Design a protein with these regions (language model features):
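Ser/Thr/Pro/Gly-rich low-complexity disordered regions
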Residues: 1-239
Length: 239
């Protein structure tokens, strides 16, 4: 500091102090912050808005980490985040970190979103029919490719003949009978997914069911007396 004055004889005078040591910085906390914009619904994109974020010590390069119910989400380190099925029912936050102009590490965390809402995901894959479309053969509903992002529930089956449900045909297999000959068979698989939505898929139809020839049952008997002039009759009542 310099002190100056005019002495009693009218001469201007001044004296200057010794210099202090270098002034040390006091780290300033960030002001403003980060907010999340976007709709917290599956498949929507959330964005970290840092327009109000400031630091008297200078902002550095910003890094991002999104979290689900407080747990960091692997790989979610950009300024936006696309919500997935895993986020449904969870609250999302984002932390923004940086090194300020004085070398101090700083971070701010957004307020949490409301719980992420589900969007129904249609079934993937489907159901196919394995087996031969011939009378007396067994058809099987193959669901090995069936999947649902919302989680599969218990599977229910309904077999149909030319589009009409077959009474009692509600298992994963169906044995073809005479009534099926000449018709096309399908199977519908239904379930309630993990989010409570009723879903169903239907197989492609088989070719027309072919007939298998059956040997006759019962037979023919002769009634009457085997005597000259008597009449014999062919009895086919059991045929």
């Amino acid at each position: 500091v310099a002190v100056s004055y005019t002495d009693g004889e009218g001469s201007p005078e001044s004296v200057t102090s010794d210099a202090t040591s270098a002034v040390t910085n006091v780290s300033h906390s960030p002001s403003g912050g980060v907010t999340i914009t976007g709709i917290p619904t599956e498949d929507q994109v959330l964005t970290a808005d840092t327009t109000t974020l400031a630091d008297e010590d200078g902002l550095g390069a910003l890094s991002y980490q999104w979290s689900r119910d407080g747990s960091p989400i692997d790989g979610a380190t950009s300024d936006n985040y696309s919500l997935t099925q895993e986020d449904v029912g969870a609250a999302i936050t984002v932390e923004v970190s940086y090194t300020d102009g004085e070398g101090a590490s700083e971070s701010v965390t957004s307020a949490a979103t409301s719980q992420v809402a589900n969007v129904n995901d249609p079934p993937a894959g489907g159901v196919t029919i394995s087996g031969t479309a011939t009378e007396d053969q067994v058809l099987t509903a193959d669901t090995t490719t069936l999947a649902d992002e919302d989680v599969l529930g218990v599977l229910n089956y309904q077999w149909s003949r030319d589009g009409s449900p077959i009474d009692g045909a509600t298992s994963s297999t169906y044995t073809l009978e005479q009534a099926d000959v000449g018709t096309a068979i399908t199977v519908a698989v239904s379930y309630t997914d993990g989010e409570g939505t009723a879903e169903s898929v239907t197989s492609d139809a088989t070719s027309a069911v072919t007939n298998v020839s059956h040997s006759p049952t019962g037979g023919v008997t002769i009634t009457g007396t085997a005597t000259e002039d008597e009449v014999l009759t062919a009895d086919t009542s059991t045929l």
